[in-house]
Amino acid sequence: MVPREGFLALLSVRACCFLFFLIRARQAFSQNQTCDSKDLNALLGFANELDLAKLGWVLNGSSSGCCCDWPGVTCGPPTVNGRRVVGLDLGGKSLRGSIPYSLAGLDQLKRLDLSVNYLQGVVPPQLLRLHLLEFIDLSTNQLEGVIPSNLSLPAIQVFNISYNQFTGGHPILGGSSNLTSFDLTSNDFYGPIDAGICNSSAKIRILRFSENRFYGDLPGGLKSCSSLTELWLSMNDLGGDLPDALFDMTSMTQLFLQGNQFSGDLSTNMSNLSNVVEIDLSLNRFSGFIPDVFGSLAKLESFSAQSNKLEGNLPSSLSDLQSLRVLNLNNNSFSGEINLNCTAMPKLSTLDLGSNSFSGPIPDMLPHCVQLTTLNLGNNNLTGEIPHSFKNFTSLSDLSLTGNHFSNVSSALQILQYCPKLTRLILTRNFHGGEMMPVDAIQGFRKMELLVIANCALTGSIPSWLANLTRLKVLDISWNRLSGSIPTWLGNLDDLFYLDLSNNSLSGQLPNSLTQMKSLVSGNKSPRVSSTENFPFFIKRNSSRKGLQYNQVSSFPPSLILGDNMLVGQILPGFRNLVVLHVLDLSWNNLSGNIPAELSGMTSLEILDLSHNNLTGAIPSSLTNLSFLSKFDVAYNNLVGQVPAEGQFSTFSRSDFEGNPGLCGFLSSPCESKDPLPPASRENNIVTLKENKTKSAIVSLLIGIGAGIVTIILLAVAYRVFLKSYSGSVMYC
């Protein structure tokens, strides 16, 4: 048994040894965290330029040399002089400023990520000569300048400077045999693509040059890119035929060539791309037929060739693509019947065949595409009625059948109401037989957000079943022959923010409920329609009497468009509540009374059209407070007084006020002075006034005769233009 004193002595020795071990371990750890002095100076210069103390970098004091534990800094193994910095990962840290030249002092750096910041200025050339650098990502900043054409980065594997403002010819990574990803997307590079881009980089798999200004033909040297899996060249000025070498890249999975000027026929060699998953050839000048090679593209999930000059029938092999999810051939010249076998296309979710020349009926088999959510057959020559099989669409949310020759609107709505997920429906420019909107028998459409049935010559009144569409955000039933009054319940649809009832025969007064629309009053979430990729949303571009034109967009401005009806009564002062409203169009009605000064409360208003009514009184000066007002039209009323000249009113034209003889001042006739004249001046003015009246009478007579002749000519021309344009007055793209 060990004596008590011996045990304590042994314990003390062991405790001392353990304490010594801890001290040595701490010293070793501290030494392991110490930077090489050269790297430390480079980091301190970098940190001082970009204020990196906020990230936890210790820039002074006894711990300032321990840079290897700073956030985003990676060091290599210990050396005699300390650890060397090999990685700097500061992506998405809200860094502001320019990249200092001192950063190039990190000569052992292998990885540099400064992406998604607010960096400006040029990239130090020395930084692009670091011979060990394998990964560099400067994407999504505001960097600019010219990148040297020949970079010396022998170890580089990933080079990403996308989404900046670089210019000049694209850099060439000569001698970079390990390069796998090269991304220049969304800059201002220009010139031809170098023919030898893959000569020394045979391992390159990802090449992204989209959204620049590259021009010329695709080089045949692309055949050296044998390992390429992704080729992104969209939105440039490239042209010519596609080289055969492009279709020798059998590893290709993604091919994006949209938004260029490529032309010619599509090669049958496309069948060689047996691994391709996505192809986008949209917005080019390709012509001829689509080769019937889809049977060889078993992995293809998305094929888009919209806005070209392609023609002929749909290739039969399209129906062999069980993997296909998206087919977009919009805006070409395809013809014949739509002959797709949906039973063999179980994954198809988006089918866009709009703006072609397809004819015949809608095929009954379409609902067999059980995952179809978006269907656009608009602007073709399709005929007949909506198939009863459409009741079986269980996933369909977006449907556009605009601009065809369908009949029986009642049947169409009664069938489509059974589509449980239908959210957006466009039936414009169909049903031209003067059919009546169905009054009842409609119980569905409970998820409907957007309903457009414009320019269909529909008769009757606004149907009451629309009141049940409680999720409705956009309603456009303009350019029909609807009559009766505007229902009060329209103002009770909580989500409705875009209402177009223009160019009908509606009568009565404006319902007060329109001034209480919840989506347009203060305190509500900004109104919008949820966007679906590849579905054509439409917004009114102008509402001239020559017809309506629509642009394809993803959202609508909050609007009340009630022009070209027979509405009477006064403009409601309560419109001041609609502080979210952007467009108020009450033109071409029979409204009377004054323009309410309260309209100045519509603080978001951009367009106010009150022309061609019977309004009286003065233009309220308070309207000059509408700072976003870009269009104001009160022509052809009975307004009097001085036209305001402040604010946005200084930007309006004379034509916006014409047809109001009582208006004076800015953009109109001068207002008469109210100050009395002295007696002597008054007598002289009486004589002068008589002489001027005689001269004015003669001049007015001559002007009147000339104006009358010109007016008759203009009316004749305008009438012919109106007749010509009314037949196709609503245009969708």
Model-derived features: positions:
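Plant-biased, solvent-exposed loop and capping regions
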Residues: M1-C733
